[in-house]
Amino acid sequence: MTPEIRAFEFALGLFAVLIGLAIADIATSFHRLLRSPARVHWDPIALLAAAFAIVITVGMWFDLWGIRQATSVRHFFLYLVLVALFFVLFLIAASSLPDETSDGVDLRDFYRRNHRYFWSLVTLFEISYVALGIHFLGSVVDRIPRVQIALVAGQWAVLIAAPVVLALARSRRIHYAGVTLLFAVVFWHYANAVIN
């Protein structure tokens, strides 16, 4: 077993906790909505935003596996950056659905009031994600076909630009289109991801 793998296994514990907390927060909020004694007015965009938070959280779990042999995983500052990134991921999850349901909830109104905060966090996450991607690909970029680099750069551009637009836009059509685009890009990115 290499030193990188041992370091990765050591670091994985805290990452697993942060990922688990993020998913548990969404599950708890969704459970409260389902069991609320007061009326809940459902909204597809709010639910799609929560689903997107789950997808990028699970995606990060797969990405962790991809960096398990990177030498820089053993460095304190990279670990700190990764913890900060997972903290932002938790904030995304925690802000995706309301916590209080006792007085009734209108998810459309919740999303309208919350979308700027939620998508700003997603933007921060994606900028950090791209920066880490550049860090990890930097040493092998000369061995990657130019077409693949262009595809990755395009994907990264969408992952940063779309949440910026969603944070600023009020139009529900733009939100449906933006969320659909984000799902398409993320699913395309992870389509061949395997933990083995």
Task: Give, region by region, the residue ranges found by the protein language model.
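Central hydrophobic cores of alpha-helical transmembrane segments
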Residues: 48, 175-187
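Alpha-helical transmembrane segments of polytopic membrane proteins
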Residues: 12-16, 74-87, 146-159
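Hydrophobic transmembrane alpha-helical segments in integral membrane proteins
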Residues: 1-22
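Membrane-interface helix-boundary motifs at transmembrane edges
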Residues: 32-45, 69-73, 102-112, 166-177
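Juxtamembrane boundary at the C-terminal end of a transmembrane helix
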Residues: 138, 187-196
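A generic, lipid-embedded transmembrane alpha helix
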Residues: 42-67
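Hydrophobic, membrane-inserted alpha-helices
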Residues: 156-165, 183-185
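Membrane-proximal helix-loop-helix units in multi-pass membrane proteins
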Residues: 83-153
